[in-house]
């Protein structure tokens, strides 16, 4: 996805990195519609889920979904998530999260989107993001209609 935002650098997104709990899932259960959306956009983007897997449900919930799951250990999760984004090539990453441990990946990625859903969002994550949405499904709306980003981020 290439998008030119007036007054900012051009975005060239090929990787989408999601946090799991509070972002793709609520209380460990995948939010309805997420699997279908990831599979729909998989020919255009490489999807990644990086998580501490608080509820131990991520592998089963994402079985059959076109994404790579990366479970990180406890301790310095924010640094682990940032490093993952950097390894992918941060200039090609859209990162999505809601937690305090997501703040560095949201800040590092070419585009960071914070979500405020049922589990809420850490203020640090919201402040680190370029965009804030009310639903993970809104993120897929940006993938389908990139000009929404232009309207939101133009200077």
Provide a role label for each language-model segment.
Residues 1-18, 155:
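Non-catalytic pre-domain segments flanking phosphatase-related domains
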Residues 10-11, 40, 68:
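Catalytic phosphate/metal-binding cores of nucleic-acid and nucleotide-processing enzymes, i.e., regions
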Residues 12-25, 66:
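Glycine-rich phosphate-binding "P-loop"
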Residues 14, 45, 90-92:
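Short coil/turn segments at beta-strand junctions that form active-site/ligand-binding loops
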Residues 23, 37-62:
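Substrate-recognition element of Asp-dependent hydrolases with the DxDx(T/V) motif
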Residues 27, 49-50, 69-74:
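Catalytic beta/alpha-barrel core
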Residues 27-44, 78-79:
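Short, acidic loop-to-helix structural element flanking the phosphoryl-transfer center
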Residues 55-155:
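C-terminal cap/substrate-recognition subdomain and adjoining C-terminal extension
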């Amino acid at each position: 996805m290439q998008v030119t935002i007036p007054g900012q650098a051009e975005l060239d997104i090929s990787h989408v990195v999601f946090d799991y709990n509070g972002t793709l899932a609520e209380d460990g259960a995948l939010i309805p519609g997420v699997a279908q959306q990831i599979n729909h956009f998989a020919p255009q983007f490489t999807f990644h889920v990086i998580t501490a897997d608080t509820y131990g449900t991520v592998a089963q919930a994402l079985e059959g979904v076109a994404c790579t799951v990366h479970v990180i250990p406890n301790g310095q999760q924010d640094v682990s998530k940032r490093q993952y984004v950097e390894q992918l090539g941060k200039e090609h990453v859209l990162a999505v999260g809601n937690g305090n441990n997501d703040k560095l990946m949201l800040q590092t990625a070419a585009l960071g989107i914070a979500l405020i859903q049922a589990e809420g969002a850490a203020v640090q994550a919201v402040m680190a993001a370029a965009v804030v949405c009310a639903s993970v499904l809104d993120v897929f709306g940006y993938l389908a209609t990139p000009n929404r980003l232009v309207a939101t981020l133009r200077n």
